[in-house]
Amino acid sequence: DFTSMYVGGGTTTVLMDELAKTLELAKKLFPSIKEVSVETDPQIMGDPQIHMLEGLVDRMSIGVQSFDDGILKMTERDKFGTGQEVFENIAKAQELFPICNVDMIFGFRGQTDEILHRDLETLLKLSPRQITTYPLMVTSQTKRSVKDSIAAPHDIMAGQYRMILDMLTEDYTQLSAWAFGKSNNEGFDEYVIDNDEYLGVGSGAFSFLGDSLYVNTFSLRRYNERIGSGNNGVERRKVFGKRSILQYRLLLQLFAGRISRKYFKEVHGVDLD
């Protein structure tokens, strides 16, 4: 049985009525679902239709990135409002949902220590139940023009991360490498840490079942065609050996900041000592 549901992949609230119907159907089909988490953007919180999700969503994760107007303009997120407007919309959201998580990013070009410090002070003033602070992640596939225009030199991130830890850990418990919560039992994270298996539904979703990782097609057209013909959306499958699975579990527990010797002994028959 499923106990938790995470609706991600961007602005999942763009069709509020469809999302509400989907959540209602999921809870009807799987009554064991007790926790529902949804991703959204700040401006949605100012939409009166957001009330359609009240009572259906337990955790609303809001992608803010920064409250600094200069950073928002550089990343083209000023379309979601000014830093002050974002602040006000999150304050409204906290009245509607049991848990509000604010997603922030550090490592932007031009994001000085002073700017990051102000962002963290703003967060502490809002006092959301959860805060997630991701480093800006650029890969070899990212266009060099994008890297040069928005990414800060990599060597500044360690100092910024230390500032985040120093400012947040007095009022928050660190839940994982990036996540902080008001208590140490918040139960929600973007990353699947506490479940050995998970099922992904929809275009671009990932599943880990048994010894295999499944990837659904990212093409909406192909996904609709596959589902319409009675097939599933899986386009790729990768089978892992026992050693690789153990490495994966170990890395997830390291990411969460806790390693359970009991888990590895009872579930996998492996003695970490």
Language-model-detected regions and their locations in the chain:
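C-terminal scaffold of the Radical SAM
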Residues: 1-270
